[in-house]
């Protein structure tokens, strides 16, 4: 178990749906005094994650969401994780989003040093979708998202009709 400790309060918000052993390795590899808020996808068997969820400072988020890629359900589980962290009695200086399949490439000492160098600076990553730097395929993936219905054949037909008519959903930022 990693015993690296430092004065900055960190929360890791983790979403997992598979490989409970990897989730356990991830938590054990990161800062020992951090708090870990974990969402397990509703499609996954919770019992398989018992070992990882029983570690110190690991908080299981009981409001499970059946996450579907490209839908608002992704936002819902993230909001549940954020709510759990901001209502926790401890104040956090840094909050990180991770997947249960992630693993740190840096040592905790290097992560700590880098965070301390950042001071109060917020680190966010994003990009504007309205730019020539983004490939056309990425824009199309965004604008022609998952159809509202689940029938695959109807979804394929809908995409073909959308492409033939030239219709594009407006992008809102």
Tell where the protein language model's regions lie, with residue ranges:
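Intrinsic-disorder-associated, low-complexity terminal segments enriched in Asp/Asn/His/Tyr and depleted
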Residues: 1-2
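ER/Golgi luminal nucleotide-sugar-dependent glycosyltransferases, focusing on the catalytic module
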Residues: 5-173
């Amino acid at each position: 178990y990693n015993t690296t400790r430092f004065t900055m309060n960190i929360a890791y918000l983790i979403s997992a749906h598979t490989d409970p052993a990897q989730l356990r390795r991830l938590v054990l590899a990161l800062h020992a005094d951090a708090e870990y808020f974990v969402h397990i996808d509703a499609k996954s068997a919770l019992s398989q994650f018992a070992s990882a969820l029983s570690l110190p400072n690991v908080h299981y988020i009981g409001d499970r969401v059946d996450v579907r890629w490209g839908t608002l359900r992704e936002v819902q589980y993230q909001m549940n994780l954020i709510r759990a962290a901001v209502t926790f009695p401890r104040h956090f200086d840094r909050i990180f989003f991770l997947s249960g399949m992630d693993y740190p490439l840096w040592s905790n000492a290097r992560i700590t040093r880098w965070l301390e160098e950042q001071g109060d600076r917020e680190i966010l990553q994003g990009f504007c979708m309205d730019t020539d730097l983004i490939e056309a395929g990425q824009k199309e993936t965004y604008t022609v998202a998952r159809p509202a219905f689940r029938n695959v054949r109807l979804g394929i037909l809908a995409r073909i009709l959308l492409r033939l008519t030239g219709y594009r959903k407006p992008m809102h930022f």
